């Protein structure tokens, strides 16, 4: 049986900033971006307020790779309807903050934003989404390209190589019974906290070694257990909140049923208006009669 490792989001905050552990993040980035990635340095997090990060269950890390590109890796556990806007803000902030005043625009760094989401972000059937920026002609349908001189000056092959790039990994909906490639092995780890014996994706063997719960110091173990407890409380709160909302919706529908029934609306019409079955409607009416006695 695969041994349990510490959660990746906590590891990003506490363990993976250590240069000795760069190999774990380098492995993940190399698999995702399909190229060999070497981390030059870990820059300051998008937010230095650790307690706020824990409170809102948002953990991020900002990496500069050997090509001078900025990579934002963010783990998000809670649902936020404006999360797409937040991703845009993060890349924009990194773009502006990491160019020196007075320098030419050509020195703007490429930003790659990677989100590992444990909730169903947006609507879509896939669990990995990739977004790039292209300019397509509205009449001829061609893709606007860099000139040969621009390619030479900026060492870029495509316009999209200049603009921010977005990756969204919906780990929460990943089917752990269907691991088909090395990226799936990483997503399996994100979701389950386990690395199977036959997994060979770069970085995972090192993750299995360096993120072993048994190797935590007493202080690290205490911090980790507190982090996991916060996750449990947050999940419990969300579950309770959802149940309360469902109860409220159920009561509102029952009130509508009784109001229509008292107005002598036929049961089939009530069913049509409320999307309830006739059996459910009759049960609501019966409950109302019992309360009125």
Give the label of every model feature segment:
Residues 71-76, 181-293:
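Short, charged alpha-helical interaction segments and adjacent helix-coil junctions
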Residues 1-221:
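Conserved single-residue anchors adjacent to enzymatic active/cofactor-binding motifs
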């Amino acid at each position: 049986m695969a041994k349990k490792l510490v959660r990746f989001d906590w590891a990003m905050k506490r363990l993976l900033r250590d240069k000795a552990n760069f190999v774990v993040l380098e492995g993940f980035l190399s698999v995702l971006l399909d190229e060999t990635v070497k981390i030059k340095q870990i820059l300051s997090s998008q937010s230095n307020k650790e307690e706020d990060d824990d409170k809102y269950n948002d953990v991020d890390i900002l990496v500069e790779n050997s090509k001078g590109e900025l990579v934002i890796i963010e783990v998000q556990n809670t649902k936020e309807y404006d999360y797409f806007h937040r991703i845009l803000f993060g890349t924009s902030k990194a773009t502006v903050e990491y160019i020196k005043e007075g320098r030419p625009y050509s020195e703007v760094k490429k930003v790659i934003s990677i989100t590992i989401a444990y909730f169903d972000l947006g609507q879509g059937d896939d669990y990995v989404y990739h977004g790039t920026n292209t300019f397509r002609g509205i009449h001829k349908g061609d893709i606007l390209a860099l000139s040969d001189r621009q390619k030479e000056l900026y060492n870029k092959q495509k316009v999209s190589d200049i603009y921010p790039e977005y990756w969204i990994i919906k780990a929460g909906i990943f089917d752990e019974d269907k691991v088909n490639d090395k990226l799936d092995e990483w997503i399996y780890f994100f979701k389950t906290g386990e690395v199977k014996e036959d997994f060979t994706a770069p970085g995972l063997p090192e993750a299995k070694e360096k993120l072993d719960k048994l190797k935590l110091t007493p202080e690290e173990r205490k911090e980790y257990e507190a982090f996991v407890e916060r996750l449990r409380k947050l999940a419990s709160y969300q579950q309770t909140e959802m149940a309360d909302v469902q109860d409220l919706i159920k009561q509102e529908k029952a009130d509508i049923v009784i109001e229509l029934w008292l107005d002598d609306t036929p049961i089939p019409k009530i069913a049509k208006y409320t999307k309830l079955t006739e059996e459910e409607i009759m049960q609501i009416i019966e409950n109302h009669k019992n309360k009125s006695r």
